[in-house]
């Protein structure tokens, strides 16, 4: 025992927490905590749920900033260059934090890319870890199909892969076979002997006997710490569990005294309080006497803080020995803008590749991403914008001349009407009331004679020269089309039979823009193509971060120093190939499947569609970053999409809006994109046209703004951290 203690005393401090306090709201989780851990040791944090174990780990990793106090990891504060978070740390969270769509090989390859491990070194390390942890060799099997114990071992493999100097394991042996657990502890001991500092949290108290030090936690404070055998001997116990029980009882007794001193309404006698106090004093005296032999010499350890601590261990993966031998040079290199940009780029590519593999392996998601936009545009062109056909219409034709019948025949040839002859107006109106007919044309007996008189004698009007129309006017679109066709057919008939032009307006050809015979679908198509790509881009990214936040995957990436910008750009890269395929197929269906005219540059059409889809992706990432569960993300996506659909001018001209509301559609990216698409496709204009270049400018501005918000929202947990660090360093 004495030799072990002497060895520990010769080691340098790896972690130091001084007077650290951290709470959530008004609740303090850890209060005035002091903790020192020496390098090359195995340390167990033991405590019930809510005792502060996870908060301590997150504080050490730099994910939480203490409300007060100081945290040093290898002599550096969290987020200092070359410290935590970063590849110096290996982290195995309790949740597992794995990507269940990936295989074991894909998982380890992804994290090797994150840590920039050389390929030859990665292969040897991978084989070593697979053998150690008895991991399955089935490369085609997803991690999600493994048992709970196997998943835990995969998570542990990820933490060990890059040979970190600091290893933080949250419940690493839960659900693992006893033999494998024993092998893991033996391996951890060999790592500690080589200089790796290991922190373990566990509920299995007796399992901590194999560690160098245990920290017994309760209600955010350390009840006791020291070597396991020493604590067992000191408290005259058989097991650590018994030691913990005695300490909890002592803590309860102390709490009683403290509460009674602060409470005038005593429910205990003075003698009871004196007895409890004397018991606590005796225990505390024993603790003070023994701590002189067991606790670290903090003053000496603090003097040992220097950069040499980084030189007496194995080199970090991906950093050359030359860099490691010159810590200042390494620090200067890592602090350079080009190096940081290069690191962000590498992480983005790694995350993008991982995301793409996840999509490819998930057949449901892949089918949705490939087929959904195509199905939507097909349904749109089939269901919207066409003219109604075979409308049930009644006719009461009492005209003794030929014009009434000629007019009905002209209407029948349009294909819009399916006429039924009735003998009486009352009978035909009843069919409208019963829903069997949309309307009725009632032609009186003198119609032909009267209409000719009206043409010949303009000074006298004969009311018999008109046809009475009865209709169900509740369907606005059908009413509009019917009235338009009734007028158009009569104009055509008058011109054919009497060479009379009823409409004094002449359309001059060639037109300035467009085709006078264009259909409503031609007006809708450009905007709908934009909106479908925009909406689908939102849907595929709006849940991207939610699951990763819940299962701890994001926390693991943050612990390894991956920036939020890398995560956001990585998701862009992962979805980009499929997004380009989707938009290509969507435009091909519109142009060649339904003959939507494109008078302008097809490249501009494609670029505008892709740009708006990028805005949709970035908006989806914002939604994902602020959502706690997937249902929230879905609801927010719908809440964003429908106002955009309604107010973008796709379904109805913006000129119809009230003046006080015009500002809202004009700030939406889909509004400008839809108008620009319509101008390019129907007018044939290019970037010189104001509406087109303004649209590109607005869409680009929205893209930059939303990416910034996505990074900020995803990084919200670190906001107070950076402000606090800034204040401290001022």
From Swiss-Prot:
Pfam families: ABC2_membrane_3, ABC_tran
Gene3D superfamilies reported for this sequence: abc type-2 transporter like domain (3.40.1710.10), P-loop containing nucleotide triphosphate hydrolases (3.40.50.300)
Biased composition (Low complexity): 282-298
Naturally occurring in which organism (per UniProt): Dictyostelium discoideum
GO cellular component, one term: plasma membrane
Family designation: Belongs to the ABC transporter superfamily.
Residues the record lists as binding ATP: 47-54
Membrane topology summary: Multi-pass membrane protein
Organism placement in taxonomy: Eukaryota, Amoebozoa, Evosea, Eumycetozoa, Dictyostelia
Assigned keywords, A-Z: ATP-binding, Membrane, Nucleotide-binding, Transmembrane, Transmembrane helix, Transport
Domain of life, per lineage: Eukaryota
Domain ABC transporter: from-to ranges: 15-244
Alphabetized GO MF terms: ABC-type transporter activity; ATP binding; ATP hydrolysis activity; ATPase-coupled transmembrane transporter activity
Subcellular localization, as worded in the UniProt entry: Membrane
Name assigned to this protein: ABC transporter G family member 20
């Amino acid at each position: 025992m004495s030799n072990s203690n002497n060895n520990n005393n010769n080691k340098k401090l790896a972690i130091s927490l001084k007077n650290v306090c951290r709470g959530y709201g008004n609740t303090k989780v850890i209060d005035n905590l002091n903790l020192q851990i020496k390098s090359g040791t195995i340390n167990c944090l033991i405590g019930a749920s809510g005792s502060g174990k996870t908060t301590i780990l997150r504080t050490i990793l730099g994910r939480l900033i203490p409300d007060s106090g100081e945290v040093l990891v290898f002599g550096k504060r969290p987020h200092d260059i070359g410290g935590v978070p970063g590849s110096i740390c290996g982290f195995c969270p309790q949740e597992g934090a794995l990507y269940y769509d990936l295989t074991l090989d894909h998982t380890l390859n992804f994290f090797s890319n994150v840590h920039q491990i050389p390929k030859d070194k990665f292969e040897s390390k991978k084989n070593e870890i697979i053998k150690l942890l008895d991991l399955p060799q089935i490369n085609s099997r997803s991690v999600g199909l493994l048992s709970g114990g196997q998943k835990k071992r995969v998570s542990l493999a990820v933490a060990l892969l890059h040979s970190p100097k600091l290893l933080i394991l949250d419940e690493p042996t839960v659900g693992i076979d006893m033999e494998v657990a024993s092998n893991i502890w033996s391996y951890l001991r060999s790592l500690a002997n080589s200089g790796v500092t290991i922190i373990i949290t566990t509920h299995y108290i007796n399992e901590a006997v194999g560690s160098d030090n245990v920290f017994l936690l309760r209600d955010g404070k350390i009840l006791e710490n020291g070597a396991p055998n020493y604590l067992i001997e000191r408290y005259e116990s058989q097991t650590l569990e018994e030691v913990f029980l005695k300490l909890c009882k002592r803590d309860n007794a102390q709490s009683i005294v403290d509460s009674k001193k602060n409470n005038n309404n005593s429910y205990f006698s003075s003698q009871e309080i004196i007895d409890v106090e004397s018991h606590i004093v005796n225990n505390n005296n024993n603790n003070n006497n023994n701590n002189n032999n067991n606790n670290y010499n903090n003053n000496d350890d603090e003097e040992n803080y220097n950069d040499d601590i980084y030189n007496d261990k194995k080199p970090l993966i991906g950093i050359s020995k030359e860099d490691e031998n010159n810590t200042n040079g390494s620090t200067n290199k890592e602090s350079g803008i080009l190096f940081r940009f290069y690191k962000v780029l590498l992480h983005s590519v790694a995350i993008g590749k991982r995301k793409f593999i996840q999509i490819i392996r998930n057949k449901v998601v892949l089918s949705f991403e490939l087929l959904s936009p195509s199905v939507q545009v097909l349904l749109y062109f089939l269901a919207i914008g066409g003219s109604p056909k075979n409308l049930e219409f009644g006719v009461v034709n009492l005209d003794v001349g030929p014009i009434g019948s000629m007019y009905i025949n002209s209407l029948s040839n349009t294909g819009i009407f399916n006429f039924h002859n009735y003998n009486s107006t009352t009978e035909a109106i009843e069919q409208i009331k019963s829903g069997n007919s949309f309307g009725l044309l009632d032609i009186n007996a003198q119609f032909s004679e009267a209409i000719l008189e009206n043409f010949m004698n303009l000074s006298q009007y004969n009311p018999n020269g008109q046809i009475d129309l009865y209709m169900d006017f509740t369907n606005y679109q059908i009413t509009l089309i019917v009235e338009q066709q009734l007028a158009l057919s009569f104009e055509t008939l008058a011109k054919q039979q009497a060479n009379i032009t009823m409409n004094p307006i002449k359309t001059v050809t060639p037109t300035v823009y467009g085709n006078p015979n264009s259909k409503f679908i031609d007006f809708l198509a450009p905007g709908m193509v934009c909106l479908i790509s925009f909406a689908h881009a939102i849907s595929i990214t709006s849940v991207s971060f939610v699951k990763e936040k819940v299962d701890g995957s994001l926390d693991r990436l943050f612990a390894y120093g991956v920036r939020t910008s890398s995560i956001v750009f990585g998701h862009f890269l992962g979805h980009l190939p499929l997004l380009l395929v989707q938009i290509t197929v969507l435009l091909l269906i519109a142009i060649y499947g339904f003959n939507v005219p494109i008078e302008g540059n097809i490249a501009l059409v494609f670029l505008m569609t892709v740009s708006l889809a990028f805005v949709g992706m970035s908006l989806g990432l914002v939604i994902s970053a602020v959502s706690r569960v997937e249902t929230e993300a879905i609801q927010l996506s719908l809440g964003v999409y429908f106002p955009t659909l309604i107010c973008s001018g796709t379904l109805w001209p913006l000129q119809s809006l009230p003046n006080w509301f015009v500002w809202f559609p004009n700030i939406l990216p889909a509004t400008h994109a839809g108008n620009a698409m319509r101008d390019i496709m129907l007018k044939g204009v290019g970037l010189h046209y104001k509406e087109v270049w303004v649209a590109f400018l607005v869409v680009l501005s929205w893209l930059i703004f939303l990416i910034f918000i996505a990074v900020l929202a995803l990084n919200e947990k670190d906001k107070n951290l950076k402000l606090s660090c800034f204040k401290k360093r001022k």
